[in-house]
Amino acid sequence: SDVYKRQILLMEKGERIDLSLFSGGTVLNKGNVCIHFDSSKSVKYEQVHGAPAKVEYNTIIVPRKGEYQLILADGSKVFLNSESKLRFPTRFEGKERRVYLEGEGYFEVAKDSMKPFIVEAKEVDVRVLGTRFNVNAYTPDKVIRTTLVSGKVQVSDRTSEEIAVLVPGQQVVWQSGHFSTREVNVSAFTAWIDGKFYFEEGATLVEITEQLQRWYDIDFIFSSERVKQFVFAGMIKKEYTANEIFSIIEKTTQVVHFNVSGRVVTVSEIK
């Protein structure tokens, strides 16, 4: 499908590789690392033994309407959501495995008790030994959510050094320097990997449209502040068109209307 057409791999020296140009079975040799492209829209890094030791950083950039997965040199798997970026070393050296996330990523971390795996997301470090978790750190939100599926993670604020430790089924929310922890339905926050939107109880139209604009590459205008706060809850497949989703929300709430004009959608209240 066309969602995979625009992913870019940025090499350390500025070389840009359009990931849509590679079909399954392609292998790129880059010094000390082999990059395998496979047909499921994912890329895998593999260390070449005996190669020179320089560690380089690559960045995968996923645009609106896109998703991508990669397997890092240690075997850890990362799923990246639309409008997200991951900067990572081509192989892990030293005492830790550190990657840098903008946007949203779901991580299945390979166990290595000697080398903690750290996701740096804006003001927060998420530190793990081996686990499955989701980090949501989109820039406009000013909120960073870490949701733990299995294992154990420690989340810390790099400035205040405040720390939160999660057990499976918990989510920690970072907002302006402080953490709050709550029990959540984990599958709700990882639904995007299974091709679904999940709008939890009490989700406002502002929060919902933020997800929709990244996936459908559209922009929303609200006719009033009041409309922004209307709520809708439910699980909807991402294979639906934007118009089908608007129609579901209209029928369910019976108080809002979506008016589509090209890539701009106006959301108004039905008086």
What are these regions (language model features)?
Residues S1-K271:
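A residue-level detector for the "anchor" residue at the start of short, highly conserved motifs
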